[in-house]
């Protein structure tokens, strides 16, 4: 029932925050590949958007032939291999069948540390010379496998991240990805729309209020100002919340909510073009930051820092930024993480921030 297609087509499992069920989508034919968000249909599908659209990472619109919803309680019984009588029940593997739990890191940490330091130095120089106000610098970690069940990982992410959007998708064009993200890019409830400015990161410590540096506060304020400016002229009845703290796994972020209405259905496409990528995953000025990322980062982001989710699918639009995510191949899981670099940033502190973010997904393994 939960097998992903092995050749052609597409399959998606997704769970929206604080719900007790997930949705399964299956398309029997190949998903539509789009050149730009300008071409994005406005209803009836699931969007998979990369950080930058290219031939290697196309923008996909999945039009499901099958849509089904499954209570988490029933899924848990199947996912753990326990049937109603408590005996072992078969569990269908995803297209990554043959993978196992990670035995070791395939990424040499010393080499990765050096690559990150060089990337940071280049990015930081751009900031100090006034080319950029902020830049998000990311890296990735390869972990070897040999028998992993992606469906079980999806269920584990649903349980450990109740406030996150959790998605598992597979297509021939993208491969298999698992995302557990706290950041909505654009979501709809009735006639009301919602997005957030989410930035600034400190470790979560139980019963200890987080302390925010001026760097973290300004980093988040940059994102909030950007989003407010992009909503100007397209959003009606705009309400901006006070900045507050939100927790996602082992880390805390600063968050500002924006709630509004849109005048026309086509404004959804226009707003996505305005918002993606936000300074929370790219930087400012946006075009210059995007070019710096492509020049300075040691590895391509692929679908990390893009977004995915249902768009006008049975009346539901929930598009979330692909922050905490991992990509599966028959031999590796590749985990992605990044952090905002400011003129006052310290390389060691930024490295440690990416380490904490990687732990969010590593703990699932």
List each model region and its residues.
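An N-terminal JmjN-like helical accessory module and its immediate linker preceding a catalytic domain
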Residues: 1-39, 43-55
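An anion-binding catalytic pocket shared by soluble metabolic enzymes
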Residues: 5-25, 139-222, 315-338
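Structural signature of FAD isoalloxazine-binding scaffolds in flavoprotein oxidoreductases
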Residues: 58-74, 318-328
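Contiguous alpha-helical scaffold segments within structured protein domains
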Residues: 67-114, 120-121, 144, 196-295
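A glycine-rich phosphate-binding loop feature that marks nucleotide/adenosyl-phosphate handling sites
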Residues: 171-177, 228, 243-251, 307-310
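Conserved hydrophobic core element of enzyme catalytic domains
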Residues: 266-365
């Amino acid at each position: 029932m939960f097998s992903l297609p092995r050749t052609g087509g597409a399959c998606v499992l997704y769970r929206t925050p604080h719900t007790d069920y997930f949705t399964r989508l299956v398309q029997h034919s190949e998903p539509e590949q789009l050149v730009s968000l300008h071409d994005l249909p406005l209803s009836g599908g699931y969007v998979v958007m990369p950080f930058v659209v290219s031939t290697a990472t196309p923008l996909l619109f999945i039009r499901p032939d099958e849509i089904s919803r499954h209570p988490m309680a029933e899924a848990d019984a199947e996912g753990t291999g326990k049937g109603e009588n408590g005996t072992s029940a078969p569990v269908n593997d995803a297209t990554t069948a043959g993978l196992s739990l990670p035995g070791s890191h395939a990424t040499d940490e010393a080499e990765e540390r050096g690559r990150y330091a060089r990337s940071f130095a280049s990015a930081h120089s751009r900031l100090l010379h006034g080319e950029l106000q902020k830049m998000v610098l990311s890296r990735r970690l390869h972990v070897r496998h040999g028998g992993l069940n992606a469906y079980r990982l999806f269920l584990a992410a649903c349980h450990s991240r109740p406030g996150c959007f959790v998605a598992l998708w597979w297509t021939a064009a993208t491969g298999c990805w698992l995302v557990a993200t706290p950041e909505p890019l654009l979501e709809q409830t009735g006639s009301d729309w919602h997005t957030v400015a989410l930035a600034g990161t400190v470790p979560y410590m139980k019963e200890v209020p987080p302390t925010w540096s001026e760097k973290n506060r300004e980093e988040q304020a940059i994102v909030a100002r950007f989003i407010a400016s992009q909503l100007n002229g397209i959003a009606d009845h705009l309400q901006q919340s006070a900045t507050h703290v939100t927790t996602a796994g082992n880390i805390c972020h600063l968050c500002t909510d924006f709630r509004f209405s849109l005048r026309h259905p086509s404004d959804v496409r226009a707003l996505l073009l305005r918002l993606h990528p936000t300074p929370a995953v790219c930087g400012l000025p946006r075009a210059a930051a995007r070019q710096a990322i492509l020049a300075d980062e040691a590895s391509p982001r692929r679908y990390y820092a893009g977004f995915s989710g249902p768009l006008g699918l049975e009346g539901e639009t929930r598009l979330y930024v692909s922050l905490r995510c991992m990509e599966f191949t028959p031999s590796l899981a590749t985990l992605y993480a990044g952090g905002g670099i400011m003129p006052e940033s310290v390389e060691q502190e930024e490295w440690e921030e990416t380490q904490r973010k990687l732990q969010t997904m590593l703990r699932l393994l």
